[in-house]
């Protein structure tokens, strides 16, 4: 039988809320040679659309990336099968919007809750606040090494961390110039200038490379000293450290390198210092990233070069689950409505894991393949539960629908001076509603890409 004339019975349906996009629930025959574009033509014909709408198609929850014939063959199904095919508005390619020029490599990114500001951390040790015109509104200087993580806390506070082994709480200001908020530290902040350090948080013994902030005033940090630490955004809740006494005590036996670091920070001797609320120890290798559980801020997840994903009870400071993989893990993001943790690895792929599954059961639910180097950053789309973006040392950001194992789109660096494999590594990515996909890296650029319909289901 010729593949040009072979047909299969299909029944189309959609979960789109817009009733005008619904078709009658009636089976019909379609050529098995059709792919997404041909199926989209059929649905648009049924809808009698004046302007064609691009659609994606799913069968049994899996995105169709081949012809119907290839799908039937792969699944071992005959053309006598009736296929129930779901259609949904297609995610359109994200287009290049802007580049903001930074002084050094961009290693960390976050955005304000109102999406009016971008916060960046850089290898020059400076944290910056950017407006959406690409202007630096504020610089926060104090770190003595590269800034590897930055997080927005409130309109008067951010936190950063880096290679100098410390975290810093910074004072910012409201748009109206006021500086008060409900942090519990207001009375002590009156004499501290905007852009200055409120407190230095110490306790890690190696670079601090990841931060996350929860709504209950808690901070998590991940370090290359193999530990995760829990802190508060309210410095009064943490134990004070007498930094100057520690430095000046002649009985302290410290290395020459440590003495040098402490000499560099003597200028910050008047800044309050705080110890962590708890130190979480279980990893046997550098911890690359840590996050709070989206629905329960007493639970955290971390990934490490020791090949493991760990689940933490932050109330008792205990590791309550360990999932062991076959490769170093470098990044993690939660997809809460799907009950999945996405993890980027040193072997170039992204794996999806269900944190509820026992560590003795099958660990990996799905593997996303497409990158050609380390996957060092992940973020999810707040408006579409299936979408994920990833940053890699291969010089790209990829957009994924996790119902498929292949990337939907690839975003490359747009600076013409970038040389592939020389200065194109991407270190950080943030997917922000109303802004787009923000990425930064070795090209010293904060790049913004945005696509129509990219946030819609």
Swiss-Prot record:
Disulfide pattern: none
Location in or out of the cell: Nucleus, Nucleolus; Nucleus, Nucleoplasm
Positions of the UniProt region annotated as Disordered: 172-191
GO terms classed as biological process: chromosome organization; maturation of 5.8S rRNA from tricistronic rRNA transcript (SSU-rRNA, 5.8S rRNA, LSU-rRNA); maturation of LSU-rRNA from tricistronic rRNA transcript (SSU-rRNA, 5.8S rRNA, LSU-rRNA); protein-RNA complex remodeling
Pfam families on file: NLE, WD40
Any one GO cellular component localisation term in the record: nucleoplasm
Keywords in alphabetical order: Nucleus, Repeat, Ribosome biogenesis, rRNA processing, WD repeat
Region (Sufficient for interaction with ERB1 and association with 66S pre-ribosomes) location: 99-457
SMART domains: WD40
Record SUPFAM superfamilies: WD40 repeat-like
Family: Belongs to the WD repeat WDR12/YTM1 family.
Main function: Component of the NOP7 complex, which is required for maturation of the 25S and 5.8S ribosomal RNAs and formation of the 60S ribosome.
Assembly behavior: Component of the NOP7 complex, composed of ERB1, NOP7 and YTM1. The complex is held together by ERB1, which interacts with NOP7 via its N-terminal domain and with YTM1 via a high-affinity interaction between the seven-bladed beta-propeller domains of the 2 proteins. The NOP7 complex associates with the 66S pre-ribosome. Interacts (via UBL domain) with MDN1 (via VWFA/MIDAS domain).
Name this polypeptide is given: Ribosome biogenesis protein YTM1
Annotated source species: Candida glabrata (strain ATCC 2001 / BCRC 20586 / JCM 3761 / NBRC 0622 / NRRL Y-65 / CBS 138) (Yeast)
Gene this protein is translated from: YTM1
